[in-house]
């Protein structure tokens, strides 16, 4: 009798347990899955793969979000409450060469299409930042400044200053770009002052004469004001492109850290203040391998007060240098202002992985911008004043055929520029460096952007955790993925 009662009690308890499981546990599990689906029903996934079958292509979410898999060993935890830097923008340089190709080589209908593909968020990649050479760089149709003079002549009053060269095709394109993307910011950087200001009496080589510091500061003021008359605000400048390198074949100039500090504190900063110019001044604008340059400039307290931050290039050193400088000078901005694609890292696979590394690691090391180099070059990697060019633009415009080809650089930049808006804040996420790297942002409209790069030859499944929600995402080998949701 007792055994029968015990069996009945045991059976009853089993029935209760099973009922509890189906009614409560399974119900809660289904509710969680339903909530995840509801919370991420506006999830967008954009993919690029090295086989080029997907080039910044929007995907069906259901093909990549995996619901019935075990928790991945790759757990990407995103914390929107832990915030870092505010982003300024993403883009490249509309060099003289690039502007010439777009304005002079392409027919009007193709030109409009290319501009939309570059600057429009919906039809293109939404470039929101341009770094413009002040005068000729290595990628120009000729060597020129805004105040060229005959040999042994000077113009200390800048009576011959003119931006007419830029008015022909650079400024009209800048205006069109600004119409397409209202958030576009423009910074400017000289490769060289006019030759008469230098010891070489030439835009190639040399350094700035000490008695030309004042007129060179006024040259910046004149440039900013003349562009303003054209309806173009110059958001920021640097005093010199790559001041530690003096190129033998194109405009350039040596400027030591001590010289730059002297120029900023006694000439450029006061000239901006006197003329009520709000344009930001950033120092350096060269590679990560010499952080001492920035430290030396910043040690000058008078120069320091005029400087908004430092600008960095990718050709030597490591991204972590920017974090080092941020930690030493947390009140100063960090900008990543030049990374060119080229034959030294061939497309597609090697260049793709290299550039996605910059897209992710630069912001993770406090950079507020990600900026490639030439927007457009031709089939010979020009126009250029160089005897030989190995650089690659975002776009190739063939002068003979008028054909337009979008290079790997276009798609890598697009993974961030199309989705992360100016004013977005980088938010915390853990990364798996050299494996499954990522960076996360919170846009001004409260949408979240997660950029993932799978640097390995194997597909991965990662668990993305955001607040109290999570989902599993499949990432193909050697691929980049941008995810967006609200």
Language model region names:
Residues 418, 429-467, 478:
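Carbohydrate-binding surface patches
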Residues 88, 123-130, 181-185, 230-236, ...:
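Loop/turn elements at helix/coil->beta-strand transitions in domains of secreted/extracellular proteins
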Residues 475-486:
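C-terminal beta-strand-rich structural cap/linker in extracellular carbohydrate-active enzymes
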Residues 56-234, 266:
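N-terminal catalytic cores of secreted or lumenal carbohydrate-active enzymes
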Residues 1-13:
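N-terminal Sec-pathway targeting helices
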Residues 333-412, 428-431:
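Aromatic/acidic polysaccharide-binding cleft in carbohydrate-active enzymes
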Residues 92, 126, 186, 237, ...:
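Conserved, mostly hydrophobic/aromatic
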Residues 215-236, 243-343:
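Active-site neighborhood of glycoside hydrolase catalytic domains
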């Amino acid at each position: 009798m007792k055994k029968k009662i015990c069996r009945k009690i045991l059976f009853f308890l089993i029935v209760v347990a099973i009922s509890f499981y189906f009614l409560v546990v399974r119900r809660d599990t289904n509710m969680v899955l339903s909530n995840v689906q509801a919370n991420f029903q506006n999830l967008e996934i954009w993919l690029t793969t090295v086989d080029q079958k997907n080039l910044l292509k929007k995907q069906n979410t259901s093909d990549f979000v995996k619901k019935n898999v075990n928790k991945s060993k790759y757990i990407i935890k995103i914390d929107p409450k832990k915030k870092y830097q505010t982003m300024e923008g993403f883009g490249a340089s509309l060099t003289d060469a690039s502007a010439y190709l777009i304005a002079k080589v392409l027919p009007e209908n193709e030109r409009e299409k290319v501009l939309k593909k570059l600057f429009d968020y919906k039809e293109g990649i939404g470039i929101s930042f341009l770094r413009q050479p002040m005068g000729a760089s290595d990628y120009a149709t000729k060597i020129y400044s805004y105040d060229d003079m005959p040999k042994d002549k000077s113009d200390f009053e800048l009576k011959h200053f003119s931006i007419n060269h830029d008015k022909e095709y650079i400024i009209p394109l800048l205006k069109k770009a600004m119409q397409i993307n209202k958030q576009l910011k423009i910074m400017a950087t000289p490769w060289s002052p006019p030759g008469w200001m230098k010891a070489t009496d030439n835009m190639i080589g040399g350094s700035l004469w000490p008695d030309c510091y004042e007129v060179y500061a006024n040259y910046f003021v004149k440039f900013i004001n003349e562009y303003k008359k054209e309806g173009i605000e110059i958001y920021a400048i640097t005093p010199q492109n790559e001041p530690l390198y003096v190129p033998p074949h194109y405009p350039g100039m040596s400027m030591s850290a001590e010289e730059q500090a002297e120029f900023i504190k006694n000439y450029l900063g006061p000239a901006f203040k006197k003329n009520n110019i709000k344009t930001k001044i950033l120092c350096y604008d060269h590679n990560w391998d010499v952080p001492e340059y920035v430290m030396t400039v910043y040690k000058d307290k008078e120069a320091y007060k005029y400087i908004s931050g430092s600008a960095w290039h990718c050709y030597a050193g490591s991204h972590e240098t920017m974090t080092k400088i941020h930690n030493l000078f947390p009140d100063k901005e960090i900008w990543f202002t030049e990374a060119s694609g080229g034959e030294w890292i061939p497309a597609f696979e090697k260049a793709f992985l290299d550039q996605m590394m910059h897209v992710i690691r630069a912001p993770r090391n406090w950079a507020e911008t990600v900026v490639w180099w030439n927007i457009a070059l031709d089939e010979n990697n020009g126009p250029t004043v160089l005897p030989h060019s190995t650089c690659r633009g975002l776009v190739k415009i063939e002068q003979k055929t008028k054909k337009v080809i979008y290079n790997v650089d276009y798609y890598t930049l697009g993974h961030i520029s199309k989705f992360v808006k100016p004013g977005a804040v980088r938010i915390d996420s853990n990364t798996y460096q050299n494996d499954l790297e990522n960076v996360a942002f919170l846009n001004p409209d409260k949408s979240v952007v997660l950029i993932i790069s799978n640097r390995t030859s194997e597909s991965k499944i990662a668990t993305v955790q955001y607040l109290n929600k999570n989902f599993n995402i499949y990432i193909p080998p050697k691929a980049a993925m941008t995810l967006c949701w609200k």
